Amino acid sequence: MTQWAMTESLEDRRRLVRVARGLEEGDLLVRGARVAQPVTREILEADVLIADGRVAVLGGTGDGLQAARVVEARGAFLAPGFIDGHVHIESSLLTPAGFARAVLLRGTTGVVAEPHEVVNVLGPQGLEWMLEAGRRSGLRVWASAPSCAPASGFEAGGARVGTAEVRQMLGQPGVLGLAEMMNYPGVLGGDEEVWAVIQAGRATGRRLDGHAAGVRGRDLQAYAAAGLHSDHEATTPEEARERLRAGLWLMVREGSAARNLQALLPVLRERPRRAMLVSDDVSVDELLELGHLDRLLRACVAGGLDPLDALALVTCNPAEYWGLHDVGLIAPGHLADFVLLRDLQSFEVLETFVGGAEAQPGELTPPLSGGGVHLGQGWDAATFEVPPGWPVLGIHAEQITTSREPEGSGDARLIVADRYGRGEWSACWTAGSGLTGGTLGISVLHDAHHAAFLGGSDTDVRMAGRALEALGGGLVVVSDGEVRASLPLPFAGLMTGEAPQEAAAGLARVTAATRALGCTLPYPVTTLSFLGLTVIPSLKLTPRGLLDVEAWQLVPSR
């Protein structure tokens, strides 16, 4: 099975040179391809000779290249394998093996995972598991070391990541840098622990990923001056250009929870040098129905980008940003990660190759202990009253930001309960979901991953909580004292070991049951999962209370 890190001896390189010189035959010859080279913005009619998992020769057709096996491209386009430079695999509800099964056939050959979901639950053990599971997946899985777990000091997760834990994770093979620094108030305010984490990342000489939602003007300049290198939170062309001018790499996010590509296409048409496409958080049903990075490429070309410029956003650009010098190009010495495409408009994938072999998704996922749901003994008698004077949390479809609505305008309660046994919970009113009865309960609540419940009577909420405990974490819909649908997520309460199709079917049942209760959100589970993320404006709910993100304080009751 191809792993993200190929062991390579000096003799392997010497053989590669001998094959390149024509002194030995290669292992694989892809003949008659049209090679798309984003870095030079040209398409070459060429044959590609491969040895020991790497490109030996990019030659003209008819050069007499020899190999033990030949694949006839018959004029198909051959492009570098796609790289997602920022993705939370856990948000797909799949393990790395399941995620690989969903994306390899869509042309994705590598991802930079940001595993702060599982790290929030289990600490550095979660990152180690993600890398090991990635090595077994058939997909190249690199990682960045989570910098904020939990995302802020307004809540506590299953684990707390401090400077010592960050240093430990940065030392893991396959970790490319520091993950998104979400605590921008701590960066700007000089928080000692935040700056110690930044310094731990700086000491490695690697990338320091940014996360600066809503930060503009002098504050953005100050954030960049702290040494952060990127941001994926731009939602308007003005924000995107401001980040590029500040020297930040622009990660254009298009996932299931936040969709920014259409808004930022005008900037991408200007061909910015330091930009890439990322999915961030994408659900399993969307992966299967719409695709992964191939879907984003189609949208870019339909929006006026040259296909080669679009390809650069998912190949050479993310590889350059992360210092992945062996991928992202079709060139001698580079890993033979490539995709055969029918054309450069639909980006229909004919075949995906990783390390010079047809992509084979892995079957095995290592075990992962811990991370269930523990609501405490007081849960069975709990009542969920909203404190007087609290504003209503406005929910907006396909966005992870919320709004502040006037008291009395709410239509469904939101309850967030600590799932790690501390016995804490709080409730607020929401507006915008359309939910008229019953409860949707989940154990996937960014980023500390407490249990969240939208709508319903106290009885339904309590029942949904106990159902989540019995599942070991997951998704559940309860109405009139009955469980209407559920999906177990036994891996840290975040992921299922089922195949993507089975996971998508389970998610579809939960979504259908939620819509039967009046919910109008296109992706109710995904939207609910971001209503507790304490570093995204405007209001977010934690087990300890309602947070005003802009004011950076809990909302007092009247």
Swiss-Prot record:
Keyword Manganese appears in the UniProt entry: yes
EC number per UniProt = 3.5.4.2
InterPro entries, per the entry: Adenine_deam, Adenine_deam_C, Amidohydro-rel, Metal-dep_hydrolase_composite, Metal_Hydrolase
Covalent S-S links between cysteines:
none
Q: Which reaction does it catalyse?
A: adenine + H2O + H(+) = hypoxanthine + NH4(+)
Enzyme class, first EC level, given as a word: hydrolase
Q: Which UniProt keywords apply?
A: Hydrolase, Manganese
Required co-factor(s) are: Mn(2+)
Family membership:
Belongs to the metallo-dependent hydrolases superfamily. Adenine deaminase family.
Q: Which HAMAP family match?
A: Adenine_deamin
Task: Output this protein's name.
Answer: Adenine deaminase
What phylogenetic lineage does the species belong to?
Bacteria, Thermotogati, Deinococcota, Deinococci, Deinococcales
Gene responsible for this protein: ade
